[in-house]
Design a protein with these regions (language model features):
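A short hydrophobic beta-strand segment most commonly corresponding to one strand
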Residues: 83, 97-114
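A short, N-terminal "cap"/entry segment at the start of jelly-roll beta-barrel domains
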Residues: 1-33, 117-154
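Short, charged/polar surface micro-motifs in flexible loops or helix N-caps
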Residues: 29-31, 41-44, 64-66, 108-111
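A generic "binding-loop/recognition-motif" signal
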Residues: 44, 53-54, 72, 88-89, ...
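Short beta-strand His + acidic residue motifs that chelate non-heme Fe in jelly-roll/DSBH
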Residues: 48, 67-68, 84, 90-96, ...
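Short acidic-glycine-tyrosine-enriched beta hairpin
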Residues: 71-87
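Glycine- and acidic-residue-biased ligand/ion/polar-headgroup-sensing regions
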Residues: 53-55, 59-65
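Conserved short histidine dyad/triad with adjacent acidic residue
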Residues: 21-23, 36-51
Length: 154
């Protein structure tokens, strides 16, 4: 068993979008899953991304969540949850006036160090680039993912 006191959790801004998050799974030594808390301030978005193998569970712990999965835009009440399958393009964002706190858990884990990825890996992971904002936050039109590896995406 492992335990993490909230006061001891290490929070940092994400590499791409600067969203404050804490990697619970890493701090607890979990090897077979990933789990993070993400705190989105008004006007912030996480990356629009996809995973090859990871299924992710998105749970809104505080606030009203907004999540785009492929072409579907969802509004998620506090304690609401969405399960997102691999290869689906997803992006949580905050176009409300209040902070949001998300729990995002997934399995199996995939490498998350975007600073060590090749340009090809980054292009697949982020079909609109690593810092694309959703239209609701002033971003451009969303592109559809292309290529043989994205048959189930978008």
């Amino acid at each position: 068993m492992a335990h993490l006191d909230p006061a001891d959790a290490l929070w940092r801004p994400s590499n791409q979008m600067g969203v404050l998050n804490t990697d619970l799974a890493k701090q607890l030594g979990a090897a077979t899953m990933g789990a993070r808390l993400w705190r989105l301030a008004p006007g912030q978005a996480s990356t629009r991304h996809r995973h090859r193998e990871t299924t992710e569970l998105y749970v809104v712990l505080e606030g009203t969540g907004r999540l785009r999965v492929d072409d579907e835009l969802l509004t998620i009440a506090t304690h609401g949850a969405v399960l997102v399958e691999p290869r689906s393009v997803r992006q949580p964002f905050n176009d409300t006036g209040a902070e949001q706190l998300w729990l995002v858990a997934g399995a199996p884990p995939e490498p998350a160090n975007t600073l060590a990825m090749t340009a090809e890996e980054l292009a697949w992971l982020y079909p609109d680039g690593p810092r694309a904002l959703p239209p609701e936050l002033g971003g451009g039109e969303l592109r559809r993912a292309e290529g043989p590896e994205s048959e189930q995406a978008v």
